[in-house]
Amino acid sequence: MFYHLLYPHHDLWSVLNLFQYVTFRTIMAILTALLISFVLGPWLIRKLQSLQSSGQPIRKDGPERHIIEKAGTPTMGGTLILVAVLVATLLWAKLTNPFIWLTLAATFGFGAIGFWDDAEKLIHKNPKGVPGRTRFLLQTLIVLAIALALKFYVNPEVFGKLAFPVFKDLVIDLGIWFFPFAVIVIVGCGNAVNLTDGLDGLAIGPAMFTAAAFALISHAAGHYNFANYLGIPFIPGASELAIFCGAIVGAALGFLWFNTYPAQVFMGDVGALALGAALGSVALMTQHELVLAIIGGVFVIETLSVIIQVASFKLIGKRVFRMAPLHHHFELKGWAEPKIIVRFWIISIILALVGLATLKVR
């Protein structure tokens, strides 16, 4: 909004030239989302505590200590992230950019599903919430609508292709398979972040690092000279996604203030599903889906641990891990919760750097 209001007057006041720069608006989006999180966080936590007498229902099949230590902690704190991201993005992004509206649609669509799921858990005291098939169907419909818009409205010639990291000219035309591929990327990422959100601050840290990395990728992909130099797909308009990613970074950092161990609030499905969908959408729109699997490797590992655990038990009747997702395995091995969280963050930072390195290694 500020771009449309202020930049047209840069001839009268040269300082308004700043608003043409994506880097400046990205930094301001980070600070705006961070400020909103800090200001609204305490009020929202008090409000959630008053509405949720017993806090988030704790899974009975999880680690026993969670029943004691985490009981009574309010959930649905992800609404704070959504508000901060929305306001910061609307203030600092170009509102004529279709990528902004499509990423917001994915984020808030998945956020709405997560909100419903959280509400079901609280109202009916059922940790399972909305049936999995219902969630998957709704998520799929949202992603298909976004994929159709990208393919037939935004840029038919650009979307529908899969670019491989490291290999400069290796691009595959997915054709009709672009649509199920989009579902795998966005729905998969949304649920992977949700699976990871099992310890205080565990999911929000890697989500923040992934968003920061994709802010750089988006800026490069939307700048012809940068994209040409790096040998990555040039996506006209994608640089505005850096502002959206910046808003996620600021909102995540602000939320972490309240979610760090011991957490005052949990993000809930409303936050985890929304963040995952946001990251998956940005990866799809910048054609860096495979790089997302590297940068968001913590989410991939957590998801694979669940798949391996279930498959192993069904096939041979034995479990590979003491408990899945993987962070629970380390809990049962006696690792302190803060140690697990920080080590997963360290791994996430390393993977983000590796993912960014693939931009240059061609």
Swiss-Prot record:
Location in or out of the cell: Cell inner membrane
Entry's transmembrane regions: 26-46, 73-93, 95-115, 136-156, 170-190, 201-221, 238-258, 265-285, 290-310, 339-359
Cofactor: Mg(2+)
One annotated Gene Ontology cellular component of this protein: plasma membrane
EC number: 2.7.8.13
Topology of the protein relative to the lipid bilayer: Multi-pass membrane protein
Reaction catalyzed: UDP-N-acetyl-alpha-D-muramoyl-L-alanyl-gamma-D-glutamyl-meso-2,6-diaminopimeloyl-D-alanyl-D-alanine + di-trans,octa-cis-undecaprenyl phosphate = di-trans,octa-cis-undecaprenyl diphospho-N-acetyl-alpha-D-muramoyl-L-alanyl-D-glutamyl-meso-2,6-diaminopimeloyl-D-alanyl-D-alanine + UMP
Role summary: Catalyzes the initial step of the lipid cycle reactions in the biosynthesis of the cell wall peptidoglycan: transfers peptidoglycan precursor phospho-MurNAc-pentapeptide from UDP-MurNAc-pentapeptide onto the lipid carrier undecaprenyl phosphate, yielding undecaprenyl-pyrophosphoryl-MurNAc-pentapeptide, known as lipid I.
The protein's name in its UniProt record: Phospho-N-acetylmuramoyl-pentapeptide-transferase
Gene: mraY
